[in-house]
Curated annotation (Swiss-Prot):
The keyword Signal appears for this protein: yes
Organism: Dictyostelium discoideum
Localization (cell): Secreted
Extent of the signal sequence: 1-28
Keywords for the protein's UniProt record, in alphabetical order: Glycoprotein, Secreted, Signal
Source taxonomy: Eukaryota, Amoebozoa, Evosea, Eumycetozoa, Dictyostelia
Protein name, UniProt field: Uncharacterized protein DDB_G0285615
GO CC, alphabetical: extracellular region
Length: 255
């Protein structure tokens, strides 16, 4: 029978301990849009992944899961982890198509893009509020930083190239559909949006005023509750963004 000598096999024991520990704290191969396990093990994380595309994690490591719902709609995205560069390129294409096909006037167009950018700012806010708790708890479940600055720079460049356009009746009808899709996204981050946690409790989800840290400190929320709320809200936003992309396709925006 094999026996370990604690004096002579110190290195072996150390290795075994390290391997065992890594099973619990290192799961870098299990990742999905918006969140990663063991973020520090992946280089340039904040530059490589797009925000908001957050969903419940796949049950296995298989990349065939690949967020099929999103792939079906964002069919030009080849990276199942939604590479930020590809998404930014898609946003450029989408914005140009909105200008060309719907013919939005500059003020209306800028308003809609600002609403989309507002979602990114909200996500930055809630990630900031929860970040200290993630770090202090030494959890491997950590949020990624949104790519808001890079995307906003591209959006601003598109805005600068626009000229005012008078809408036809058809274009106005298309814009109404566009606005309806945007409104759903806005509603998902508004003061009136409630998220349930625990058995019967609900809290208003408004990341401008809601401090997760206060709820956690008062024992109203646990860290896991806060994580779940972020995930749930982002899933809702993601679903509405799917609807928005579907609307664009319906309007023949060539997205």
């Amino acid at each position: 029978m094999f026996k370990l000598n604690f004096k002579n096999n110190y290195k072996v024991l150390t290795l075994l301990f390290s391997l065992t520990l890594s099973m619990f704290v290192s799961n870098a191969q299990v990742y999905y849009p918006g969140y990663l396990n063991n973020v520090s093990s992946i280089s340039t994380v904040s530059a490589d992944y797009f925000p908001l595309l957050v969903h419940n994690p796949p049950l296995t490591n298989s990349t065939t899961y690949s967020f099929n719902e999103a792939i079906n709609l964002l069919d030009t995205v080849t990276d199942p982890i939604f590479n930020a560069t590809q998404i930014q390129a898609l946003l450029n294409t989408w914005a140009s198509n909105v200008k060309a096909v719907i013919g939005l006037s500059l003020p209306i167009y800028v308003t809609q893009l600002n609403r989309i950018n507002r979602i990114d700012l909200l996500s930055i806010q809630m990630y900031t509020e929860t970040n200290s708790a993630f770090i202090l708890s030494a959890t491997t479940y950590a949020p990624l930083k949104p790519q808001g600055v890079s995307i906003l720079n591209q959006v601003n460049a598109i805005k600068a190239s626009l000229n005012g356009i008078t809408l036809t009746t058809t274009q106005q009808a298309q814009l109404t559909q566009f606005n309806a899709a945007i409104s759903k996204i806005q509603l998902s981050v508004s003061n009136s949006h409630l998220i349930t946690f625990g058995a019967n409790d609900v809290i208003p989800f408004n990341s401008d005023s809601l401090s997760y840290m206060e709820y956690i400190a008062d024992d109203i929320l646990t860290l896991d509750d806060a994580i779940d709320i972020i995930k749930q809200n982002n899933v809702r936003i993601l679903n509405y963004i799917y609807d928005l992309y579907s609307t664009h396709k319906t309007l023949s925006l060539n997205f």
